[in-house]
Amino acid sequence: MTSPAPTLPVHPRRIGLLDRVGFSVTLLATGCFALILGGAIVYPGFLTPAYILQQLQIASFLGVIATGAMLVILLGEIDLSVPWTVTGTAIVVTNIAGSHNPMLASLAIPLGLATGATIGLVNGLGVAVFRVPAMVWTLAVNAMLLGAAVFYTGGFKPQGAVPWLATYAALGHTLGAPNAFMLWLIIGAITLWLLRRTIYGRYLYAMGNSQRALFLAGARVRTITVCTFVLAGILSSLGAILLTGYTNQAYQGMGDAYLMPVIAAVVIGGTSIQGGSGTYLGTFVGAVFITLLSSILAVMQMPDAARQIIFGAIILAMLLAYRWPATRVAGTNQ
């Protein structure tokens, strides 16, 4: 008679992570359906396919930017330079596209992405090399970008043109689906591959859990940090380019409205604000949820101050809700 093969114990932290991620995605998906059904009471058009596709299109702008923010938060850091990375990129792109040099104008989008990469590089070096806390460094960079933009434009609306490719990406459709949403799906697939299938993804999660342990294991933690901030800067710039195409302009404070929603989308999606845990699926659904909520608040003519209060309250409520499965799992393992 043979004895049964022993089963390997599952680490309680792993159970808690899977439970929390599944709980967050389920809760957010339920919330999305509830918002659509509740919004239909106020505005019947909420249930139409055209409205849902429009919301997915708008969610794409937030989702692309939130992708970069999630990577930084997985490190256990936070990027507060998002608002003026977005605005600065929009100003650069429209000014270059509106130049009278056709060759230079054709480089508007690549140079816009390079702007985001440069800002991300500055942020990464400040955090990884100079050891300044990310919250302080990126906030200072954001203030410098604001000052540079106001100095360059004189405080007036930036002049220039919008690249046709930005307009096509933001407003065009392919097989009935918004191009912006299709682009977001592609970026999401690449992000999932990076997080699940590459050594970079494993290092990213490990750094969020214990940067010192990863350093002692021989990993190049400074390089990982810098690369992550560069990716976040590029994605913020890509979001800015899409926004420029959608609004057909660049304007002062273009990215100001995105800082809180970006953080909210990542956090309510189940990514730990302390780093080391979270999935992109949660961030994806979180961006859709925030977009639907913003749409309903706009229909209700809610003032911007009230929207910010609601965003903050939702973040706190979701964080408290996520403690329930983690506490329950911890209790069963005692």
Question: What function would you assign to each model-found segment?
Answer:
Residues 1-37, 189, 209, 216, ...:
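Cytosolic-side transmembrane-helix boundaries in multi-pass membrane proteins
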Residues 25-30, 55, 63, 84-88, ...:
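Hydrophobic alpha-helical transmembrane segments
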Residues 31-47, 75, 149-157, 192-199, ...:
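Structural signal for alpha-helical transmembrane segments and their membrane-water exit/capping regions
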Residues 34-101, 125-132, 266-280, 313:
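Single transmembrane alpha-helix segments in multi-pass membrane proteins
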Residues 101-142, 285-289:
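Alpha-helical transmembrane segments within multi-pass membrane transporters and channels
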Residues 104-112, 118-123, 173-250:
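Helix-loop-helix "hairpin" substructures at the membrane interface of multi-pass membrane proteins
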Residues 130, 134-197, 224-227, 246-255, ...:
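Transmembrane helix-bundle core of multi-pass membrane transporters
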Residues 236, 246-312:
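Transmembrane alpha-helical segments in multi-pass inner-membrane proteins
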